Amino acid sequence: MPEPVKSAPVPKKGSKKAINKAQKKDGKKRKRSRKESYSVYVYKVLKQVHPDTGISSKAMGIMNSFVNDIFERIAGEASRLAHYNKRSTITSREIQTAVRLLLPGELAKHAVSEGTKAVTKYTSSK
């Protein structure tokens, strides 16, 4: 009767033989890819408006998605406007018009005034 073949011992969960997922074949750790988000800026604005209020990570994820969505919409509309006018550069004028087209009534007015204020502050600091 043939003897049963023994396989190599399986390393236990916490053993040193288990290979770390973040390690390459040569033993060096891989650098984690950086995830860009607006969370730092959302948090700064939150603290300006409501200093005693916090935000959950789920809510921060939603806010990040919202900012990305609005950014893409404005950029797309500004790009279209530049193309219609046979321009190769998106200026603050295209951005302002895109905001007026995308945002409703009073919200557009406030966004335009805040944007103008931010551009003025930026140009004066140069």
Swiss-Prot record:
List residues modified as N6-acetyllysine.
Answer: 6, 12-13, 16-17, 21, 24, 86
List every position bearing N6-glutaryllysine: 17, 35, 44, 47, 109, 117, 121
Residue numbers bearing the N6-lactoyllysine modification: 6, 12, 16-17, 21, 24, 44, 86, 109, 117, 121
Modification Phosphoserine occurs at: 15, 37
Q: Point out the glycosylated residues in this chain.
A: 113
Q: Where is this region: Disordered?
A: 1-36
> What is annotated about its quaternary structure and interactions?
The nucleosome is a histone octamer containing two molecules each of H2A, H2B, H3 and H4 assembled in one H3-H4 heterotetramer and two H2A-H2B heterodimers. The octamer wraps approximately 147 bp of DNA.
Its recorded name reads: Histone H2B type 1-M
Please name the source species. Homo sapiens
Taxon lineage? Eukaryota, Metazoa, Chordata, Craniata, Vertebrata
| Designated gene of the protein | H2BC14
